[in-house]
């Protein structure tokens, strides 16, 4: 596996920008390259300046509008400045109030059934007016005015929700309208080549009507004009459809789901369905979904940088600073809030309304393809200019013949009108060569395949937040995966327990231990239990671990509400992924203070100095007893159980801080008394082992990075196939986060490639691993769900956040959200990533074949005979097949298992591989040879010698045009499978591909048989049709024979200095395959 990764083309080389080495040198030498993440505006501007801008409106129509991006940033900054000014003003007013200057607020006026108007709420929330809140009776009084219960929320029935939305508004904001179809139509008209063709068409139309009359004279100019209009309409329709598709995907990205309290139970709703009066639980990583006031909280701290631009973390207090701004993130602690403002009645709503039009995104592949288009376009321009000069020279020197064999131009005799008409036709041919030569379909193909892939990935439970992640995922060489919920089902149940100094029945503990365990479970939790009024099963909320422990508490006889009412929380330390534990201090009914801790078993056990024995007495934690518990932990962990310990200690009530000091109190975590250790079963997901094997066969190493015990991680890794039964299970294959953390960067770099499992890791350990792997040249994908995973998700080449267990902070730092938290979905993302790249390569092979063939045929014919067999209208039709229909057919190929049998795609590898060069040259040489032979010897070969010369020439040119188009149609089948011999595999299942082929053929028949005057064709008999079909079909066996021709290992592109932007030079181990 290691050797496979070392030779993989997906690995970064020494000078790769993505590895962070020699960035400036590399970027300077490759204009058409941008980083896959966080490209600077300057870098994005640089490649545009280098691109061929003859037809900029089409070239850049699928790229980021840099001017609009700058305007968006400025608008965001203005609104942030406004929010910042409001906060400063609020602090000033707070100081004034403290000095005795009290701001008065008028009495609340009724608003429907509620006791406060929307205007009053908006003024209070936006000004952070504590005085107004006090006048309304504080948070409880405000809740009464809004007819909500701080502990149970609103009733949540349809009538209540409708009233609240009617009076206070909904949590939505007006979206700026995207570009309409007419705008896309107008943009398509700005293509300079099409404008020149349209001018030529108008001139030809006017001259034709003048010389031949309206009945016959409109054909040439009218045909070109119609063809140009058709290209414009098809381009606009395609662009408009893609715009709608991306808009729908953007809507899905913004649709956050969260829990609210309604009718006493926690229910999950869309952020758009939040109403004023809702009570919302807040936990680390959540986004504050609306403006509101804090009801209660423990160590609650917010990151308000999204609104104020300041990265400072702000502590929130229900008494002193209760106002919460929509859009901020919960950085620490937990609490619950009462919603007071939604939608445009919030600063965040105003911000989103002002920038809600998504401005697209640049992807590295789009930029590289623009580099390809620039090079080919330059050749096309040179060829077109040469053809123009040659045709004009031949015409004015009398070498261009008319239908009677005489010179078309005779100095002093040919009328000026005829000269202008002939020159316009020559110009039209030259411009049309540019239209066909410049492969504008390449950016369209990227957009099509990305849009198609993103839509299909949604069905595969993956929501793409950043387009370039689709491409980058195809290059991934390693995946650092979480265990819980990704490799396992996240359906946890307590199945074993140690308490009273021995292994016990999970449902029967000594009475003394039971009472303390129930107290700890009910208070030291962010979950809850809802008891339906009409009876029925209990409803648990919270994380899977919390649910499992709450369920265990119920089996022990716990009544959740009763247990919570018997003590009150003084202070809480929410679970911390660094410390691997969370604690709470409670005051019991008899005035005692208990500090309860819950967390990773061996970490909590290490803090215990005693335990409660089976008689309910506190006994010292001897070495023997500590070893007994440790062996129990190892035994459970070795059987894939997740081990959690519960402990407590008493604390002197008089030493408990009060006032402001209470919020800063660090709960004591030493001298603990062990209550119980439980083993929680979290089964492996079905099929995850097959997914891991699929990754390994594809050259992608899967590594498990988990906060669980090393032994639990080892057992799960063996079950999932990450570790083989005969693998070396010592360091560094199996390593603990602490050991890795204490190493130097150099030491980490030596072993990081060998790590398969990292247990008891913190989010920072994951970040260190990602950084080390990237330094080693890996393209790293990372899964994460917690707020503290954000740095690793951001640092990785592809950050994958969990959609179910993931916090909003993690999701916002990610590139792709895995909606079902399933590792199998991660593997599907890898398949789609490879499919994006493969589909683009298929289209490049197809399009370049057409480019080369059309250019050579017209150039050779123009130089030798002064005429071209493929007319302007015919070339525009070919352009339509190539740019739009071809892109649609080849860019929407679904991924195949064949893709997962290859090593990862190298992001800096040549786009045109040796296999593609071989395939396209074989087809292009064949087409050029056959069609030029027909051009020069067609009349005799086809037996047309006895026909009228003009008719014979027209039949010959029609056969050339027809055969050329059919060659492209049949060659689309070859392009589907560039390196496979069976080009028909799975073709019937791809209905879109077959539909486009049928449409192309039907339209071609119509053009040849019924639109002769429009397309300069004539009807063909069945024998002539058979010849055309035969010429096209031969491309199939020719492609098959060609696939037996070996290709060199070193990419041809490396030897061609002029093609440097098609890929960076590979090392000697690089392959010329996809």
Curated annotation (Swiss-Prot):
Pfam family, one: CaATP_NAI
Catalytic activity field: Ca(2+)(in) + ATP + H2O = Ca(2+)(out) + ADP + phosphate + H(+)
Enzyme class: translocase
Gene3D superfamilies the UniProt entry points to: 1.20.5.170, Calcium-transporting ATPase, cytoplasmic domain N, Calcium-transporting ATPase, cytoplasmic transduction domain A, Calcium-transporting ATPase, transmembrane domain, HAD superfamily/HAD-like
Binding site for Mg(2+): 785, 789
Domain of life per record: Eukaryota
Location of the active site: 482 (4-aspartylphosphate intermediate)
Biological-process GO terms, alphabetical: response to nematode
Cytoplasmic-side segments: 1-180, 241-369, 445-840, 892-911, 972-989, 1044-1074
Activity regulation (UniProt): Activated by calmodulin.
Coarse class of the protein's main subcellular location: membrane
Stretches that traverse the bilayer: 181-201, 220-240, 370-389, 427-444, 841-859, 871-891, 912-934, 950-971, 990-1011, 1022-1043
Intracellular or extracellular location(s): Cell membrane
Molecular function in Gene Ontology: ATP binding; ATP hydrolysis activity; calmodulin binding; metal ion binding; P-type calcium transporter activity
Keywords: ATP-binding, Calcium, Calcium transport, Calmodulin-binding, Cell membrane, Ion transport, Magnesium, Membrane, Metal-binding, Nucleotide-binding, Translocase, Transmembrane, Transmembrane helix, Transport
E.C. no: 7.2.2.10
PANTHER family per record: CALCIUM-TRANSPORTING ATPASE, CATION TRANSPORTING ATPASE
Family: Belongs to the cation transport ATPase (P-type) (TC 3.A.3) family. Type IIB subfamily.
Domain description: The N-terminus contains an autoinhibitory calmodulin-binding domain, which binds calmodulin in a calcium-dependent fashion.
Protein known as: Calcium-transporting ATPase 8, plasma membrane-type
Annotated source species: Arabidopsis thaliana (Mouse-ear cress)
Gene: ACA8
């Amino acid at each position: 596996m290691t050797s496979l990764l070392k030779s993989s083309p997906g690995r970064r080389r020494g000078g790769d920008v993505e590895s962070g080495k020699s960035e400036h040198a590399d970027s300077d030498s490759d204009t058409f390259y941008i980083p896959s993440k966080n490209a600077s505006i300057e870098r994005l501007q640089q490649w545009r300046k280098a691109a061929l801008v003859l037809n900029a409106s089409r070239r850049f129509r699928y790229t980021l509008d840099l001017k609009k991006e700058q305007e968006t940033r400025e608008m965001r900054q203005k609104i942030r400045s406004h929010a910042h000014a409001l906060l400063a003003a609020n602090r000033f007013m707070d100081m004034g109030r403290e000095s005795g200057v009290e701001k008065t607020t008028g009495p609340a006026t009724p608003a429907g059934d509620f006791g406060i108007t929307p205007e009053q709420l908006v003024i209070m929330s936006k000004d952070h007016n504590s005085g107004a809140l006090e006048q309304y009776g504080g948070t409880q009084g405000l809740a009464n005015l809004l007819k909500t219960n701080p502990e149970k929320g609103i009733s949540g029935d349809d009538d209540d929700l409708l009233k609240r939305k009617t009076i206070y508004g909904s949590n939505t904001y007006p979206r700026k309208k995207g570009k309409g179809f007419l705008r896309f139509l107008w943009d398509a008209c700005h293509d300079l080549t099409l404008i020149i063709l349209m001018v030529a068409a108008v001139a030809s139309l006017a001259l034709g009507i003048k010389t031949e009359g309206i009945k016959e004279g409109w054909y040439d100019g009218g045909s070109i004009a119609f063809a140009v209009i058709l290209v414009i309409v098809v381009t606009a329709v395609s662009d408009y459809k893609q715009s709608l598709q991306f808009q729908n995907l953007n809507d899905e990205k913004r649709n956050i789901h969260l829990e609210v309290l309604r009718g006493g139970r926690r229910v999950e709703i869309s952020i758009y369905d939040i109403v004023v009066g809702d009570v919302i639980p807040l936990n680390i990583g959540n986004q504050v979904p609306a403006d509101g006031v804090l009801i209660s909280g423990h160590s609650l701290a917010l990151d308000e940088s999204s609104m104020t631009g300041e990265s400072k973390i702000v502590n929130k207090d229900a008494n002193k600073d209760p106002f919460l701004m929509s859009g901020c993130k919960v950085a620490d602690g937990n609490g619950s809030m009462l919603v007071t403002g939604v939608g445009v009645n919030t600063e965040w709503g105003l911000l989103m309304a002002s920038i809600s039009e998504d401005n697209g995104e640049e992807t590295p592949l789009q930029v590289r393809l623009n580099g390809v288009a620039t090079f080919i376009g330059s050749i096309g321009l040179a060829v077109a200019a040469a053809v123009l000069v040659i045709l004009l020279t031949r015409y004015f020197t009398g070498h261009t013949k008319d239908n009677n064999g005489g010179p078309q131009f005779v100095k002093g005799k040919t009328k000026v009108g005829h000269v202008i008409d002939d020159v316009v036709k020559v110009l039209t041919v030259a411009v049309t060569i540019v239209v066909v030569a410049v492969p504008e379909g390449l950016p369209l193909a990227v957009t099509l395949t990305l849009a198609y892939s993103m839509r299909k990935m949604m069905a595969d439970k993956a929501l793409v937040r950043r387009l370039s992640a689709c491409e980058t995922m195809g290059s991934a060489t390693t995946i650092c995966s979480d265990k819980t919920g990704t490799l396992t089902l996240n359906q946890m149940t307590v199945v074993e327990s140690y308490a009273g100094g021995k292994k016990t029945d999970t449902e029967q503990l000594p009475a003394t231990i039971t009472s303390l365990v129930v107290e700890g479970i009910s208070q030291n939790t962010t979950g809850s239990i809802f008891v339906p009024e009409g009876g029925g099963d209990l409803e648990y909320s919270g994380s899977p671990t919390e649910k499992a422990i709450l369920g265990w508490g119920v089996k022990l006889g716990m009544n959740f509400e009763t247990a919570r009412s018997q003590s009150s929380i003084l202070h809480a330390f929410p679970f911390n992924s660094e410390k691997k534990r969370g604690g709470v201090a409670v005051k019991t009914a008899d005035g005692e203070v208990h500090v309860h801790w819950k967390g990773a078993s061996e970490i909590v056990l290490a803090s215990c100095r005693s335990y409660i024995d089976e008689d309910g007495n506190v006994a010292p934690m001897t070495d023997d007893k500590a070893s007994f518990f440790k062996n129990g932990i190892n035994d459970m962990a070795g059987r894939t159980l997740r081990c959690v310990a519960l402990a407590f200690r008493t604390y002197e009530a008089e030493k408990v801080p009060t006032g402001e000091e209470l919020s800063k109190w660090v709960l004591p975590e030493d001298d603990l008394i062990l209550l119980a250790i439980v083993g929680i079963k979290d089964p492996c997901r079905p099929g995850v082992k097959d997914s891991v094997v699929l990754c390994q066969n594809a050259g992608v190493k899967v590594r498990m990075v988990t906060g669980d015990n090393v032994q639990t991680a080892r057992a799960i890794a063996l079950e999932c196939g990450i570790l083989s039964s005969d693998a070396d299970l010592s360091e560094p294959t199996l390593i603990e986060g602490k050991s890795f953390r204490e190493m130097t960067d150099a030491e980490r770099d030596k072993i990081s490639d060998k790590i398969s499992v990292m247990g008891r890791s913190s989010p920072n350990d994951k970040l260190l691993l990602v950084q080390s792997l990237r330094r080693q040249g890996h393209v790293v994908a990372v899964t994460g769900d917690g707020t503290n995973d954000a740095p690793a998700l951001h640092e990785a080449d592809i950050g994958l956040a969990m959609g179910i267990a993931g916090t909003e902070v993690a999701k916002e730092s990610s590139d792709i959200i895995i909606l079902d938290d399933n590792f199998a979905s991660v593997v599907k993302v890898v398949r789609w990533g490879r499919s994006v790249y493969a589909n683009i390569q298929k289209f490049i092979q197809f399009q370049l074949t057409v480019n080369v063939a059309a250019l050579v045929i017209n150039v050779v014919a123009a130089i030798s005979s002064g005429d071209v067999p493929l007319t302007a209208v015919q070339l525009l039709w070919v352009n339509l097949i190539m740019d739009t229909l071809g892109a649609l057919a080849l860019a929407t190929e679904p991924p195949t298992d064949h893709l997962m049998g290859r090593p990862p795609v190298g992001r800096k590898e040549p786009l045109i591989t040796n296999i593609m060069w071989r395939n396209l040259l074989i087809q292009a040489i064949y087409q050029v040879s056959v069609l030029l032979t027909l051009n020069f010897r067609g009349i005799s070969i086809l037996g047309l010698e006895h026909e009228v010369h003009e008719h014979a020439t027209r039949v010959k040119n029609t056969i050339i045009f027809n055969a050329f188009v059919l060659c492209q149609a049949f060659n689309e089948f070859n392009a589907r499978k560039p390196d496979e011999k069976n080009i028909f595999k799975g073709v019937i299942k791809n209905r879109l591909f077959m539909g486009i082929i049928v449409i192309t053929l039907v339209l071609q028949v119509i053009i040849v048989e019924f639109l002769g005057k429009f397309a300069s064709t004539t009807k063909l008999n069945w024998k002539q049709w058979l010849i055309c079909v035969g010429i096209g079909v031969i491309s199939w066996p020719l492609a098959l024979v060609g696939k037996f021709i070996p290709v060199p290992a070193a990419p041809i592109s490396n030897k061609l200095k002029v093609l440097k932007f098609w890929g960076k030079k590979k090392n000697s181990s690089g392959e010329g395959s996809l």
